A protein has these predicted regions:
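N-terminal export and membrane-targeting signals
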Residues: 1-11
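Primary mode marks residue(s) on the alpha4-beta5-alpha5 output face of response regulator receiver
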Residues: 19-278
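C-terminal motif of bacterial Sec signal peptides marking the signal peptidase cleavage site
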Residues: 14-17
Length: 278
């Protein structure tokens, strides 16, 4: 039996006025010079907000586009290759104490960053544990400043699958309920290219070539970070037991454990991950 506990790597309208004029011919038979003055009346109509995105829309996004605060790409048919699927469109709470908040304010960005991850499970299915052990993530977008100035007040939540840390997996069809199936968990599960903690280790979707797989998570108790030593100790026995159960020979097996860092704990990740050879 060999083991390698390691610290968990950080996851992760433009309105245009137009006027026309007509030249009035002189009543005199003698040509004469004429002067014309054209005035443009201001358009006092209320701008119409741009339409909100639609739920169940799909997009071809790069990783950089997926983690940007706004999205400018057009939707594509979901039956074709894509990398993101919209599972929720909500409304921003833009008024606070009678003031209209900017779309890029911390409060509104926090609203979206909290809402979308909570709703991901309604789209992809599975248990909380199965979602933790997957490479499926939620990303979110708000209107651009220009769209917001025109009245847009929506936010959009998309589901994506990480092929690896900074690369999205190409998708076809819908992610609806995918983690409720063994096939979906095998495709989108969390795997590794080598033993966690070694130089060759890269976290990948299990659809990719891999040699290790995440087996379970270990939730750490309390609201305060317990410290590195306690976080490390908390996972050793649970991970060893999970690897033993998964191994062909319960007397000869390998296991690994990644525990959360203080920074990850502060970001909301209060669990470690157990690994074993695939």
């Amino acid at each position: 039996m060999t083991r390698r506990p390691v610290a968990l790597a950080l996851l992760l309208v433009v309105l245009t006025g137009c006027s026309t004029g007509s030249d009035q011919p002189s009543s005199s038979s003698t040509p004469s010079a004429t002067t014309q003055t054209t005035t443009s009346q201001p358009d006092t109509r209320t701008p119409k907000p741009p339409p909100a995105p639609g739920v169940d829309s799909c997009y071809r996004l790069s990783y950089a586009q997926a983690v940007a605060p706004t999205a400018r790409t057009e939707a594509v048919p979901c039956r074709r290759g894509h990398t993101a699927e919209t599972f929720h469109v909500g409304r921003l709470d833009r008024v606070l104490d009678g003031r209209l908040l900017a779309v890029d304010s911390h409060r509104l960005q926090e609203q979206v960053a909290t809402t979308c991850p909570k709703l991901l499970g309604e789209r992809v299915g599975g248990t909380e544990e199965q979602r933790r052990l997957s490479m499926l993530r939620s990303v979110w977008f708000t209107p651009t400043l220009k769209q917001s100035d025109a009245g847009a007040d929506w936010f959009r939540c998309d589901a994506v699958a990480l092929a690896r840390s900074t690369e999205l997996l190409e998708l076809t069809g819908s992610l609806s309920g995918v983690l409720g199936t063994e096939e979906g968990r095998d495709r989108f599960g969390m795997c590794g290219t080598a033993e966690p903690g070694t130089a060759g280790f890269v976290r990948v979707a299990c659809a990719q070539s891999h040699t290790w797989r995440a087996l379970r998570t270990v939730t750490l108790p309390g609201s305060d970070y317990p410290g590195e030593s306690a976080a490390k100790r908390a996972g050793e026995e649970p991970c060893k037991a999970a690897a033993r159960t998964n191994a062909p020979d319960p007397l000869d097996f390998q296991w690994g454990y990644e525990w959360p860092t203080a920074a990850q704990w502060a970001a909301g990740q209060a669990y470690g991950i157990c690994w074993a050879p695939a």
